[in-house]
Amino acid sequence: DDLKNRIANIVVGYTKNQEPVKVSQLNAEGAITALLRDAFQPNLVQTLENNPAFMHGGPFANIAHGCNSVMATKSALKMADYVVTEAGFGADLGAEKFFNIKCRKAGLSPDAVVLVATTKALKMHGGIKKEDLKEENVQAIKDGCKNLERHIQNIAKFGVPVTVGINEYFTDTKDEHQAIIDFCEAHGVACKISSHWENGGEGAADLASHVADLVDKNESSFETLYDDDMSLWDKTRHIATSIYGAEDIVAE
């Protein structure tokens, strides 16, 4: 019934008078729900290293909520001691929606966050052109860490402990990595290098071990950013000002 009601409330278009047209007005919610009956079951697949994984839903956060289905996450929690799920498109967009929407509606309480960083992205944030990103530039890394700092601050608003994971590439240098590590240490955040891109699971072992220890400490005090009883406009303003640094929001 919950799924059917949500489908019924989907806006599919607008009338000439700019009134929203919902699926319920087309009497199509029953048929759509029936079509989703089989698709609603998570797909159990295996990684290249024969580890189990659920692939179920994957909308990007710039167009939707940016995370997989509640069914997949809850199924995984029943089958494993630790569950890793991706909330893509940055801590300002993907993580915010994961926390405020998915976790709220599904009753989930995350134990830890891995904030993924790359030297290329940080150098780009530091003002380096795309064609020059393969060249070592420690100063650009330091300048780009201002962006990383904001993501760390955003996650802190939800009360979940965070670790920065450096997604290592073969063009990275030790000095660039050290600049990121030093920055994180100065802000009281652990930082681990992960070479899974090149070395698979073995390359992520140190990061995984650290996160498991962090989870076992049970230090998370997760809370959502806003209350359900706030108006849609107030919720939007609160997200814009607290996560994105906006002064206010305007709509016509």
Kindly label every feature range from the protein language model.
Residues 1-252:
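Flexible phosphate-sensing "switch/lid" loops adjacent to ATP/NTP-binding sites
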